[in-house]
Each structure stands twice: as C-alpha cells, then as structure tokens.
Amino acid sequence: MLALRRFILNQRSLRSCTIPILVGALIIILVLFQLVTHRNDALIRSSNVNSTNKKTLKDADPKVLIEAFGSPEVDPVDTIPVSPLELVPFYDQSIDTKRSSSWLINKKGYYKHFNELSLTDRCKFYFRTLYTLDDEWTNSVKKLEYSINDNEGVDEGKDANGNPMDEKSERLYRRKYDMFQAFERIRAYDRCFMQANPVNIQEIFPKSDKMSKERVQSKLIKTLNATFPNYDPDNFKKYDQFEFEHKMFPFINNFTTETFHEMVPKITSPFGKVLEQGFLPKFDHKTGKVQEYFKYEYDPSKTFWANWRDMSAKVAGRGIVLSLGSNQFPLAVKFIASLRFEGNTLPIQVVYRGDELSQELVDKLIYAARSPDFKPVENNYDNSTNVPQEIWFLDVSNTIHPKWRGDFGSYKSKWLVVLLNLLQEFVFLDIDAISYEKIDNYFKTTEYQKTGTVFYRERALRENVNERCIARYETLLPRNLESKNFQNSLLIDPDHALNECDNTLTTEEYIFKAFFHHRRQHQLEAGLFAVDKSKHTIPLVLAAMIHLAKNTAHCTHGDKENFWLGFLAAGHTYALQGVYSGAIGDYVKKTDLNGKRQEAAVEICSGQIAHMSTDKKTLLWVNGGGTFCKHDNAAKDDWKKDGDFKKFKDQFKTFEEMEKYYYITPISSKYVILPDPKSDDWHRASAGACGGYIWCATHKTLLKPYSYNHRTTHGELITLDEEQRLHIDAVNTVWSHANKDNTRSFTEEEIKELENSRHEQS
C-alpha cells in the first residue's frame, strides 16, 4: 500500500513538472518563429533598400524582364509598367528570395506568390494599381489603338488629343492605350466580380479606417516600391466604385446607388402603359405572365454588370429580344404575325433608343401583338393558332451615356439589345428571321445545354479578312500573365487548331483555323442565337467593343463575327452548331457544265439563308423573310432594268405580277442545298434581282480526273418531308400576307377591355 502511494505521488510530481516544461517550450517556439519572421522581413527590407539605393531595372533577372515586358532588354520606355500584372514577376521574385533564405518549415504557405494569394487580395492589388500606374487610364475605344507594327491608327505621331509625339512617346502611347490593356482589365473584372464567389467591389474602394488592416496589400506595396519607387500607391483613394465603373465602361451612363433607378430602361407595357421610372415587371417563369411590378434596389457590394444581371433575372427567365427601328416596321408586323400563328408564349422585349421608334409605331405594334382582330390569313394548316404576344418596349436612352448614344446605329444597335435586355436567358432574332422551331427549343439544344450559347453557321463564302485585321484581333487574346495570375486562358489551343486535320477539330477550333489561318470571314450568322446572360455578360461587352473600335469596325461584314470573337477573347465557352447554312427553294439544273468532268449540277437561288438541324432533316429557321424579296423598293427598281435582267423579268407579264412574286408569294420549301464548304459553290445571282441580295447554292457531281467512272459528290441536296413542308408553307403564308396597313392604335375602351380579359384569364 505504501508503495502504491509513493507511485501516485511521483506521477503527480511528474505531471506538475511537465506542464511548465511544455508551456515553456511553446513560448520558445513562438519566440523563435517571431525572430525568424523578423529576420526574413528584415532581410527583404534590407534587400529592398539596397535595390532602391544601388540597383535599377538593369540589374533585374532577365527571366523576370521577359515575363513582365516580353524582352530581357532594358529600355526606359518599354519597361515602364502599364499594367498591374507587369509588376507581378518582380513581386514573385522577392517571394522566391524570402523562401530561399527562410528557416520556416511552412515557408511556401507563409510566403505566397501572387497567384497563390486570395482572389480578393489579387483583385484589390490589380484594380488599385491601375490608378497607381496612371489615373487617366481608360477603356474608351474612341481613345484606344491596336498595338501592331502598323502606321495606321496613330495619326502622324499624334495622340488622341492631337498633341505631337516623338518616337519614344509614341511607343509609350501605344503601350498605354493598347486595346489589349482594356481587354485585360475587363477580363480581370469578369474574374473578380462576375464569376463564382465574387469579390465585394466595396473592398476595392474601402473607407480609410479599413485600410490599416490590409496586411497583404501592405506587403505587396512595400515590395514593389523597392523596384518602382516613384509611384503613389494611394492614388486610387481619390476615386470611388462608381467612377471606376464609368472608366471601365464609358458607354454606360454615370450613376450611383441612389440614382441607379434613373438609368433603368423606360418600359412600355403590352397595353401601351409607360411604367414609372425605375419600376420593372416581374414575370412568372412558368406562365410568362406578369405577377407584380417592383423597383430594383442597387446592391453596392456588386458591380454594375452583376446588378444588371441580377435585375434581369428578377424580371424574367427566358424570352425573345429584338432590335427594331422605324424603317423595319413592316417586317416587324410580319414577325409578330408569325409568332402569333406558331403559338409563342415567351415574352418579347424590343430594346431601342427613344428616337429609333416613334410612339405611333409602338402603338401599332401593340395592336398587331394583342388585337383579336389581327388574324392570320387563311391557310391549309390544321394546327394554326393566334396567340396574343407579350411584347414590351425598353427605351435605353437613359442607360447609355449621352456622348455614346450616336455610336449604336445600324448593325451596332444589336449590342444594346443583347447587353441591356432584362432577361436572364434570351433568344435574339433579326426582324426578318423566321423560326419554324418553337423558340423555347433553342434553349434545349445540345450546344446550349453544354455552354449556355448556341450560334449558327454562315454561308461558306470565299471572302477573306484583311491581314491587318487578323493581327489586331490576335492582340486581344489572353496572355501568359493573365493565365497565370487570374486563370484567364485561351480556350482554344492555336497550335492544335492550326496543325491538326480539319476532321479532328471541334466546330469552334475549325472556325478559329479558318478565320485566323486561312483568313476566311463569314463564319457565324447572327440572325438567330441564344445566350445565357447570367453566365456570359462580359463576352458580349468585349464583342461590342471590337465592333465599336474604329480599326476593327469594318474588318468583317456587320456584327456577326464579333460575337464569337468576343467569347474567344473573354475565355468563355461557346458553341456553334456544326452545319453550314444553305439555300431553300426549287432547284434548277445547271447547263453551263464544266466540259465532261462536271456530269450533273443543280442550284437553288434565294434571298434566304436556311439553317438545318444537326441531323440535316429539319429546317430550323431562315434569315431573309418568307418571300422572294424583303426590300420594299426592289421590285420597282428591278422592273426598270434591262440587259441581263431582261431574261428574269420576261417571266412576268406585268409589273404587278412581278411585285406579287417578290412580296406576296411564299418561297418554295421543297428543297435545301447545303454546298460543299471546301468548294466555291456559292455565287451571287447574275441577274441582280432583289437589289443583288439573291445568292445561289450549288450541288454537283464530278468525274474524277482521268477516271472512267469514279465520281465525287459536292454538297447535299435535301428534300424536306411533306409534314414539315405543310408547316413551313403555312408560316411563310402568314408572314407574307401580314400587312402593316392592318394595324392601328387601340382606343382606351379597347385597352380596358383587353386588360380585363387578361386579368380574368390569369
């Protein structure tokens, strides 16, 4: 028993000694950690002081110079940083120095490279340092240039304000005002504020009392001041998040949290009621009907485009968006008639600037969309309907900065539609496009389900892009510093796309190769496409900028190529359906065969661009309307023609007969020809009918050279089935007979009656 008591007392004594020993050991470890940390920080401070006092960029590691500026050569002009990312290699080098001299076991976790920092810290540094390097930075395409080895762009050694520049000043000017810099900034904006786990924009421009707690930012600034000591890291404090938004997107009007409602589109309802400024309709996603009206409260923790995205999602899920001007009113009436006939239930938003569409025409379009008296012409289709359309008009005049309102004319008006509509997901249609497929089905395509986009192919026309334009486009793509530090990468590997066989490439890779290597334009046909705006706002912004920039505005025809180029530049996934477009109608046999080699050929000449399903069995949609010609005065002008046109004109006994053929008779839906994209099998109709807008597609069979019976077929001749043709013909008949003269404005009594009827139905 005595022995047991001694054992217990010894154990207690041992425990009483162990606890102080453990506590003491812990204190020693903490002290050593502080000493080591202090040693490392002191070492780097000493190194920084020495570099400031004794070293210049001439002493920098060539590898760092290459990563930052693209060259190991130290040039006073070319090594002036114009992007915050050009500073990062110097910071990373200092981290390497700390790691190599550190005694810490977890030194890699303690001393982090820039790309290992939190997204918040990287974004803070990037956007604050923009102001450190140059608080006059801009994303205005009116001031930016493409930095290629070309004299075009900088006017005889003058800057955007007309001030003369010497050679070195011009070089620096080109670097500072390079379009690439704007694209890099917007991609960083996308990464920081628009994707998963976004950064709070208010943390970029915080109140001063929060600044002292930013340990990581302090380290970044101290380290970089060693190499670049003449910059003011506090420059950004002069600005706030709203001034930042305007510098990022100059075409958007100025606003604050309190004034945001003033720039919300002015909205006209399907019954002609103009909503109070700032108020928006909220649609039921299932019924497509308006549940209530609400005023969106701007969230200052988010950016402008994040707020616009969230606001759009609260208004409506899916819908149709249109670009429309007064001169397109007759086509708009036909468009609405075809949607009524096909039973569309998706809401429609017409996005326009106030002066583009008069109130009289708005009232008439509302009549065409809602009146029970606006009926489709009689036809033989058993499943016809006449569903009133939910058409809303969004005047975005106040959303656009006054200095930019005149920059969105013609094809460029489409950018306002795709950016400023109030839908989470949308299908855009040209006003002369006709979809034979239910609009909602475009959201169900394989391409859309995979990427949140579906675009369609153009005709395979043999028309090249200017080599200078290709060089400009190439400068816009993400580079290594972005890829490393913000994970903004080019989703298509250029080497793979250019070197692999065409049949092994995806549609997107094939288009990349055709455009950038073979310089072939006409890749995308933008008459109908679908985009999930909740995922893909920024690619549309970049696409608009490419089209608005003076040196790429006319590189391709209209807006179409800019869509996929915007997605490519943004590093976002996108999808084009793989089938090239074709021509629809009756075919004629060609008689001008190429000697004995071309044994057979047929062609279809039409004013429509026809788009088939992936299996090439179903006609999805056409661009160009449902009759021979969509242009109002073309028949009168063509009737006056002689020469080559006389043979075409001789088909008709009178002008009235030709006019009916042009504007009333629906196009034939018997056949579609999809020409061989590798052959030159598209040509403009020689007669020049419909103002030269008729194109011919050829399907041919050739005898192989020096062969007796080996034949090759080029292109495809598709016969549409009878059931499909009945539907297509009925839609085209309704489209062709819908007449603007059958529209008018509702009376107040009619509007009340329609609204009451609508409430009863809901």
UniProtKB/Swiss-Prot annotation:
Keywords assigned: Glycoprotein, Glycosyltransferase, Golgi apparatus, Membrane, Signal-anchor, Transferase, Transmembrane, Transmembrane helix
Record localization: Golgi apparatus membrane
Protein name: Alpha-1,3-mannosyltransferase MNN1
Enzyme Commission designation: 2.4.1.-
Gene designation per UniProt: MNN1
Broadest EC class assigned to this enzyme: transferase
GO MF annotation terms: alpha-1,3-mannosyltransferase activity
Protein's membrane topology: Single-pass type II membrane protein
Note from the entry: Present with 1780 molecules/cell in log phase SD medium.
UniProt-listed InterPro entries: Alpha_mannosyltransferase (IPR022751), Nucleotide-diphossugar_trans (IPR029044)
Pathway recorded for this protein: Protein modification; protein glycosylation
Family assignment from sequence similarity: Belongs to the MNN1/MNT family.
Record has Glycosyltransferase as a keyword: yes
